Amino acid sequence: MFRRPFIIALLCIVVHVVNAQSVFHKQLADSALTLTKDKVSYDPSYFTIKYPNGDVPTDKGVCTDVVIRTYRKMGVDLQKEVHEDMSVYFSLYPKIWGLSRTDKNIDHRRVPNLMTFFKRKEGALPITKKPEDYLEGDIVCWSLGGAITHIGIVANKKSRNHKRPLIIHNIGAGQVLEDCLFRYKVIGHFRYQP
């Protein structure tokens, strides 16, 4: 007797949560797209930045800065979130740079650290070769060969043949919208909403 209303109420909650999540990721993709209007030079230099809500100079940046700036437009400070998680779980993060403690200036600007953070926050999704699995607002990470990694955000726009979503990223030509989803080896696929 009470079971049916309970199931209906539960389904309504699930639909509401899924819908709210899709709205967030649509807004995330829209926010990322606005970054392509800014003139930004690729600059991998180490910068001392404020904390929290620190950023490198607005006319400079790398691939991770696209993700960081996009989430910041949505009110999410990845610098703070990554730093706080690394401070508690430092041993779970990559040891590629030989550091013995966190660094608020750079930790959030490293692709392997962002990948670890998104995995820890249960944002990891399957890596596939199917373009339809990559939805607007998703985060994609690639290996460019050797130890070089890259990251970008799935846009809400499609390739000319309408088969693949475009990517907003910075691989050297500034913050651009490009058809490059499967150009490199995909090593991470994430959907993160705090």
Task: Place the predicted regions along the sequence by residue.
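...with weaker cross-activation on analogous glycine-rich loops/strands in unrelated enzymes
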Residues: 24-29, 87-168
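Second-shell loop/turn segments in exported
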Residues: 49-58, 100-104, 125-128, 173-178
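Hydrophobic h-region of N-terminal signal peptides that target proteins for export
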Residues: 10-19
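Sec-exported extracytoplasmic/periplasmic mature domains
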Residues: 33, 37, 68-76, 83, ...
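Low-complexity, Gly/Ser/Thr/Pro-rich intrinsically disordered linker/tail segments
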Residues: 162-194
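Active-site-adjacent structural segments surrounding the nucleophilic cysteine of cysteine proteases
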Residues: 19-61
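Acidic helix-start/capping segments at beta-turn-to-alpha-helix junctions
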Residues: 44-64, 77-101
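Sec-dependent signal peptide recognition
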Residues: 3-10
